[in-house]
Curated annotation (Swiss-Prot):
Residue ranges for the DNA-binding region feature of this UniProt entry: 63-86, 115-138, 166-189
Annotated PANTHER family: MYB PROTEIN-RELATED
Domain HTH myb-type: 35-86, 87-142, 143-193
Protein name: Transcriptional activator Myb
Alphabetized InterPro entries for the sequence: C-myb_C, Homeodomain-like_sf, Myb_dom, MYB_TF, SANT/Myb, Tscrpt_reg_Wos2-domain
Cross-link type Glycyl lysine isopeptide (Lys-Gly) (interchain with G-Cter in SUMO2), residue numbers: 476
GO cellular component terms, A-Z: cytosol; nucleoplasm; nucleus; RNA polymerase II transcription regulator complex
Region (Negative regulatory domain): 328-460
Region feature (Interaction with HIPK2 and NLK): 90-193
Length: 636
C-alpha cells in the first residue's frame, strides 16, 4: 500500500487506494537502488510502456511475475498503476446521470467508506473517483450556495493559522468540502485578501476600546492561553496569576417575584477546542440567523458591566445590595490587579454570603481549570431572555448606581472630612437619581456655588451685531484703543488735534460769518426735491466761501443735525471753547475738490461727442426711429 501524499486535497482518509495517479508524471526523480527508496519516485515513461507490454503478455492475474521485470517496483504498485492509470478501460470523462444515481444507491447500501466495493459495480470507475464524486457533488450535506462573509472570515483566520491544510479547515465549515474550500481560496479569496485588503483587521491604534477589551477579556467566544490557578491566601483574598480575567458565573436559580426585571441568565463555562470556536458560533447561526446579533448584543452588555465593576473597590460583605433577592451569588475576580489586591468585587446573593474560590487549585471544576475555555450563553435561555435584554441592561445600571450611592453615603455622614493633599481620580459612575437632602448639598464641601443669573446680568452685555462690527473694525484697522469718556479729556484731545491740523495745513475758520443762514439753506435743500438741491449747489455760497469752511452752525443744537456727532468720542456737551471745536470740521484751502476746466481740442471734440461722419451716419437713423414713438410710462 502506497503512502498517502503529504499535501492531499481530499478529506476522507479511510480508503487504501490513494496512490499517485498522474498520466504524465515522468519528470520526477529517477529510481534508486535499494528497498529504502521503493515507491518514493514517480513512474517514468519507459516504466509505463514496459508495464503495458508485460500486462499484454502475462495478463492481470499474477502481479508478482510482472514486478520481477520492473526493478524498484512492487506487485502492489504495478497493480495500482495499471488499474488506476494505464488501464484503457478507465473512464476519465464527465459523470453521467446514471452513474451519479448508481453511486447514490451504492452509498446508501454500503456506506460512504467502502469505495473499493462500490467501484466494482461501476465499470470504468475506481474507488477514488467514486469517493471524490460523492464528497464533492452528490453528498446532500454539501452546500452549493454562494459563500457568505462569515465563511470567508473563518477560512481567512484558519488559513493564517493552518496554511494549506484544507482537510483541517473543512472541519470548521460543515457542508463545505476541502476541495471546494481550496478552489474558493485560490480562485477568489487570495486575490481579494492580498490585493484588495478583504477581511483585513484594522490596526491596533485605530481599534475602539470596546474591541480592545473584547480581545483581551475573551468573553463569549474567546479562549485563554493559560489556566487560572487560584488559591486563597491567609488573609482571605484570592491571588490569581493569569493573562486574562477569569469569570465564574453560576446559573440563576429561585428568582423571586420581587425582582423588578425577572431576567435569568444561564451562562456555562465549557471546554471547547480552540480551532472549533468558529464552528460552534456557526452552529448557533445556522439554527437562528438573528441569534448571532443577539449574542453580540449580550456580549457587549456583559463587557460594559464588567468594565464598570472593575473600576470600583471591593465593598463590605454586608451591604444594602445583598438584600435584593433573585440575584444568585456571583464571584468576579479581576486578575489584572497585582498580588494581594484581587478580591471579589461585589456580592449579589440572597443570604449575604460572599462566594469564595476553592483553596486547592486542583479542586476547581474541570471546566474552570481548562486552558481553552469560553463563555457560551445557553441556547434555550437566550431565546427566552433576549426580549428582556434592555430591561436587564437597566437593571445592571440600577445596581451599579446603587453600589456607588451606598458606598458614598457612609463617607458623606462625617462632620469634618479631611481633604487629601493630592487629588484622587474618580471612578466612572452610572448616572442615577440623586437622593441627597437639599440642606446636605448646600453644606457640602465639594459643592460648586451656583451662579445666579442676576449676578451675571449686573454688567452690560454687548449685542451680537456690535460684536460683529467691532471684530470687523479690528481686522481692518487694528485693535481698538480705549479713550477716556469725560468731557474735559475730550476737549483737550480735540484741542491737540485742531492745533496739529492748523499747523500743517493753515486752517482758517470762517464759519461765524455765514453760519446760521447757510445751515438753514442746507436743511431746506436736503428736504426739498432734487431740482432745488441742484440749484443750491450752483449758487454763490460755494464761491463766496471758496470751499474753505464746513457748513455747520455754531449755535445749532444737536437735535437739528442728529447724524453729525455719532462717534462715542465726539458725543460731548458743547463747551465754552466753541471756536476750537469748530476748527476740527473745516476743510483746508490747499485741497481743491475739482481742478480747473480745460477746453477740448478741435480733433478730440468731434470724436468724443459723436460728431464724426461715421457716428452721425449711424446715429441719424437711430434718432428718427426713436422719435417715431411717443413717450410712455415704464411699468416695472
Amino acid at each position: 500500500m502506497a503512502r498517502r501524499p503529504r499535501h492531499s486535497i481530499y478529506s476522507s482518509d479511510e480508503d487504501d487506494e490513494d496512490i499517485e495517479m498522474c498520466d504524465h508524471d515522468y519528470d520526477g526523480l529517477l529510481p534508486k537502488s535499494g528497498k529504502r527508496h521503493l515507491g518514493k519516485t514517480r513512474w517514468t515513461r519507459e516504466e509505463d510502456e514496459k508495464l503495458k507490454k508485460l500486462v499484454e503478455q502475462n495478463g492481470t492475474d499474477d502481479w508478482k511475475v510482472i514486478a520481477n521485470y520492473l526493478p524498484n517496483r512492487t506487485d502492489v504498485q504495478c497493480q495500482h498503476r495499471w488499474q488506476k492509470v494505464l488501464n484503457p478501460e478507465l473512464i476519465k470523462g464527465p459523470w453521467t446521470k446514471e452513474e451519479d444515481q448508481r453511486v447514490i444507491e451504492l452509498v446508501q447500501k454500503y456506506g460512504p467508506k467502502r469505495w473499493s466495493v462500490i467501484a466494482k459495480h461501476l465499470k470504468g470507475r475506481i474507488g477514488k473517483q467514486c469517493r471524490e464524486r460523492w464528497h464533492n457533488h452528490l453528498n446532500p450535506e454539501v452546500k452549493k450556495t454562494s459563500w457568505t462573509e462569515e465563511e470567508d472570515r473563518i477560512i481567512y483566520q484558519a488559513h493564517k493559522r493552518l496554511g494549506n491544510r484544507w482537510a483541517e479547515i473543512a472541519k470548521l465549515l460543515p457542508g463545505r468540502t476541502d476541495n471546494a474550500i481550496k478552489n474558493h481560496w485560490n480562485s477568489t479569496m487570495r486575490r481579494k485578501v492580498e490585493q484588495e485588503g478583504y477581511l483585513q483587521e484594522p490596526s491596533k491604534a485605530s481599534q475602539t476600546p470596546v474591541a480592545t477589551s473584547f480581545q483581551k477579556n475573551n468573553h463569549l467566544m474567546g479562549f485563554g492561553h493559560a489556566s487560572p490557578p487560584s488559591q486563597l491566601s491567609p488573609s482571605g483574598q484570592s491571588s490569581v496569576n493569569s493573562e486574562y480575567p477569569y469569570y465564574h458565573i453560576a446559573e440563576a436559580q429561585n428568582i423571586s417575584s420581587h425582582v423588578p426585571y425577572p431576567v435569568a441568565l444561564h451562562v456555562n463555562i465549557v471546554n471547547v477546542p480552540q480551532p472549533a470556536a468558529a464552528a460552534i458560533q456557526r452552529h448557533y447561526n445556522d439554527e437562528d440567523p438573528e441569534k448571532e446579533k443577539r449574542i453580540k448584543e449580550l456580549e457587549l452588555l456583559l463587557m460594559s458591566t464588567e468594565n464598570e465593576l472593575k473600576g470600583q473597590q471591593a465593598l463590605p460583605t454586608q451591604n444594602h445590595t445583598c438584600s435584593y433577592p433573585g440575584w444568585h451569588s456571583t464571584s468576579i475576580v479581576d486578575q489584572t490587579r497585582p498580588h494581594g489586591d484581587s478580591a471579589p468585587v461585589s456580592c449579589l446573593g440572597e443570604h449575604h454570603a460572599t462566594p469564595s474560590l476553592p483553596a486547592d487549585p486542583g479542586s476547581l471544576p474541570e471546566e474552570s481549570a481548562s486552558p481553552a475555555r469560553c463563555m457560551i450563553v445557553h441556547q434555550g435561555t437566550i431565546l427566552d431572555n433576549v426580549k428582556n435584554l434592555l430591561e436587564f441592561a437597566e437593571t445592571l445600571q440600577f445596581i451599579d448606581s446603587f453600589l456607588n450611592t451606598s458606598s458614598n453615603h457612609e463617607s458623606s455622614g462625617l462632620d469634618a472630612p479631611t481633604l487629601p493633599s493630592t487629588p484622587l481620580i474618580g471612578h466612572k459612575l452610572t448616572p442615577c437619581r440623586d437622593q441627597t437632602v437639599k440642606t446636605q448639598k448646600e453644606n457640602s464641601i465639594f459643592r460648586t456655588p451656583a451662579i445666579k443669573r442676576s449676578i451675571l446680568e449686573s454688567s452690560p452685555r454687548t449685542p451680537t451685531p456690535f460684536k460683529h462690527a467691532l471684530a470687523a473694525q479690528e481686522i481692518k484697522y487694528g485693535p481698538l484703543k480705549m479713550l477716556p469718556q469725560t468731557p474735559s479729556h475730550a476737549v483737550e484731545d480735540l484741542q491737540d488735534v485742531i492745533k496739529q491740523e492748523s499747523d500743517e495745513s493753515g486752517i482758517v475758520a470762517e464759519f461765524q460769518e455765514s453760519g446760521p443762514p447757510l445751515l438753514k439753506k442746507i436743511k431746506q435743500e436736503v428736504e426739498s426735491p432734487t431740482e432745488k438741491s441742484g440749484n443750491f449747489f450752483c449758487s454763490n455760497h460755494w464761491a463766496e466761501n471758496s470751499l474753505s469752511t464746513q457748513l455747520f452752525s455754531q449755535a445749532s443744537p444737536v437735535a437739528d443735525a442728529p447724524n453729525i456727532l455719532t462717534s462715542s468720542v465726539l458725543m460731548t456737551p458743547v463747551s465754552e471753547d466753541e471756536d476750537n471745536v469748530l476748527k476740527a470740521f473745516t476743510v483746508p484751502k490747499n485741497r481743491p475738490l475739482v481742478g480747473p476746466l480745460q477746453p477740448c481740442s478741435g480733433a478730440w471734440e468731434p470724436a468724443s461727442c459723436g460728431k464724426t461722419e461715421d457716428q452721425m451716419t449711424a446715429s441719424g437713423p437711430a434718432r428718427k426711429y426713436v422719435n417715431a414713438f411717443s413717450a410712455r410710462t415704464l411699468v416695472m
